């Protein structure tokens, strides 16, 4: 049985760090207010010359280096983003160009904060189906460019960045002990589309628009939806919460992260948390968190890693991965 095995990880952050103290000078808020409600202490903001594609390409090159591979070894790029450099071509094609690749194929997946789980699931399907052997899976965002910087309820939450993984097809016995993606479950429910959205687009306003969110509504649904899809992944794999070595959640805010871990009975010692340092980077948050946990030695070969996310739409999903 073919499995999609992680060969390397990488990440990239903009140069500018925006602390809560500096945020106090930009909008009517306070460090205490932000930390108590979200757990966020700082975030990174893209500056001139820094784009979704430039950050994504930087993360991709680091992932390739970690894998001991070159762009020539990759035959597919999939980028999860809601903030591409252009309406078209895709961020993935822009990244492909930055990597000097003229072979293979590249495309974007847009599922907002769940985007990286959707992208990993899609890449795994291509690998299992024999359509790709080595895939760059990237989550990259510049959400700072769609924020309403007068809206203190949203502008304090988000940051920019990118993370990337290299997935490679490996033949194995197909047991739960084998390395690679074990199972993934995706969901969406468009009846909630107006609870977290951007109020613009080429087909409606002809403008980029700004992010709008009903925070209480998002929080009300988040923990239950996340827990439900994770339970589906456990049922499909025969694994349980006790088997999980590391939970890597979408870094939305600390309350949602803590609530999901508690509902699943996963101790916080097993949860990778970077929201305090990165803020909510949407589709980039999971690969950024993975990169941190791999670099500091927490995630090791053989570990069972659980990814989960929820985003606008609503979209949500979970993926179990043997590292």
Curated annotation (Swiss-Prot):
Localization per record: Cytoplasm
Spans annotated as ACP-binding: 251-255
A family per Pfam: ACP_syn_III_C
Keywords tagged on the record: Acyltransferase, Cytoplasm, Fatty acid biosynthesis, Fatty acid metabolism, Lipid biosynthesis, Lipid metabolism, Multifunctional enzyme, Transferase
InterPro entries hit by this protein: ACP_syn_III_C, ACP_syn_III_N, FabH, Thiolase-like
Gene3D superfamilies: 3.40.47.10
Domain of life: Bacteria
Catalytic activities: malonyl-[ACP] + acetyl-CoA + H(+) = 3-oxobutanoyl-[ACP] + CO2 + CoA
Chief place where the protein resides: cytoplasm
A single GO cellular-component term on record: cytoplasm
Residue ranges of the TM segments: none
Its EC number(s): 2.3.1.180
Biological processes, Gene Ontology terms: fatty acid biosynthetic process
Keyword Electron transport applies: no
A single MF term (Gene Ontology): 3-oxoacyl-[acyl-carrier-protein] synthase activity
Function: Catalyzes the condensation reaction of fatty acid synthesis by the addition to an acyl acceptor of two carbons from malonyl-ACP. Catalyzes the first condensation reaction which initiates fatty acid synthesis and may therefore play a role in governing the total rate of fatty acid production. Possesses both acetoacetyl-ACP synthase and acetyl transacylase activities. Its substrate specificity determines the biosynthesis of branched-chain and/or straight-chain of fatty acids.
Subunit structure: Homodimer.
Protein name as it appears in the record: Beta-ketoacyl-[acyl-carrier-protein] synthase III
Encoding gene per record: fabH
């Amino acid at each position: 049985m073919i499995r999609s095995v992680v060969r390397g990880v990488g990440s990239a952050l903009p140069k500018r760090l925006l602390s809560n103290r500096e945020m106090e000078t930009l909008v009517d808020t306070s460090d205490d207010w932000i930390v108590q409600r979200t757990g966020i202490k700082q975030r990174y903001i893209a500056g001139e010359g820094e784009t979704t594609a430039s950050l994504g390409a930087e993360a991709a090159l680091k992932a390739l280096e970690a894998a001991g591979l070159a762009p020539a070894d990759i035959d597919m790029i999939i980028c999860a983003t809601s903030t591409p450099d252009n309406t078209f071509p895709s961020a993935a094609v822009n990244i492909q160009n930055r990597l000097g690749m003229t072979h293979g194929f590249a495309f974007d997946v847009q599922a907002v904060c769940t985007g990286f789980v959707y992208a990993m699931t899609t890449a795994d399907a291509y690998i299992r189906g024999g359509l790709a052997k080595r895939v760059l899976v990237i989550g990259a965002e510049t959400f700072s460019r769609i924020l309403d910087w007068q809206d203190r309820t949203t502008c304090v939450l988000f940051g920019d960045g990118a993370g990337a993984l290299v997935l490679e097809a490996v033949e194995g016995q197909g047991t739960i002990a084998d390395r690679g993606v074990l199972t993934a479950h995706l969901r969406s429910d468009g009846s909630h589309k107006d609870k977290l959205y951007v109020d613009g687009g080429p087909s409606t306003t002809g403008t980029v628009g700004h992010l709008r969110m009903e925070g209480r509504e998002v929080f009300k649904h988040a923990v239950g939806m996340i827990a439900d899809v994770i339970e589906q992944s456990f049922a499909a794999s025969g694994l349980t919460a006790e088997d999980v070595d590391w939970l890597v959640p979408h870094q939305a805010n600390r309350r949602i992260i803590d609530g999901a871990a508690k509902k699943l009975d996963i101790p916080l010692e097993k949860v990778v948390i970077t929201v305090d340092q990165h803020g909510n980077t949407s589709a980039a948050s999971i690969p950024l968190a993975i990169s941190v946990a791999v670099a500091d030695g927490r995630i090791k070969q053989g570990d069972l890693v659980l990814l989960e996310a929820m985003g606008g739409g609503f979209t949500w999903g979970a993926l179990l991965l043997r590292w």
